[in-house]
Amino acid sequence: MKNYKALESKILTGKYDDKNIHSLFLPSFGAITIQILQILDHFKLPKNENEWALQHGRVTEKAYQFRDLQTDSIKLKEIISYEKAEQLANEIFNKQKEILSVADEMPISWTSIDGHTTHLTTADKWGNVVALTQTIGPTMGSKVASKGLGFLYAVTLGGYLGKYKPGDRANSHISPTFIEKNGK
């Protein structure tokens, strides 16, 4: 912790319908969030929950193929390109044969009402917006806090495990994102 330094965040921008999407660059996966929304923008709204789940699953699976390419500035522009999203949407659409019932196939952890993530968003009268997402794991995380710091540690790194060396910043699928319409 003594070598940790907070860095200024880079904001990425995309579009969905008539709205602007603003999300964070790495270590957050804001580029992937933008890509998912832009791909979805090329589909009709699903008729029911099963279609919604299948559509979002396919779109997310397609977008996640680009996770490791976010560090390349040329690939990053392609990832958040609306034209690339249209191409990917066409690939997904062309592979769809039929809508299956997926509710019975979902792991129980995907449908559990018990959660351990808190998200807060607030705005003031001048339009300043702050969002905070905190995930520490079930039952208050590790139940360990450093004296004087005022926060609990996560129980597990879960999805953050990977090819990290000392000093690397762990990437996060948590991507604070703001949707803006008409400048608001």
Predicted features along the sequence, with ranges:
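Long, well-ordered, tryptophan-enriched scaffold segments
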Residues: M1-H22, L26
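Short, small/polar residue-rich loop motifs at catalytic or cofactor-binding pockets
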Residues: L7-E8, D114-T117, S172-I174
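Conserved beta-strand and immediately adjacent loop positions that scaffold enzyme active sites
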Residues: I11, H119, T177
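Glycine-rich phosphate/pyrophosphate-binding beta-alpha loops
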Residues: I21-G30, T117-T121, T133-V144
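N-terminal accessory/precursor segments of enzymes
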Residues: H22-K44, G167-K184
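Internal maturation/activation junctions in enzymes
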Residues: L45-T135, L149
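Active-site rim segments in enzyme catalytic domains, especially the processed small/beta chain
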Residues: N128-K184
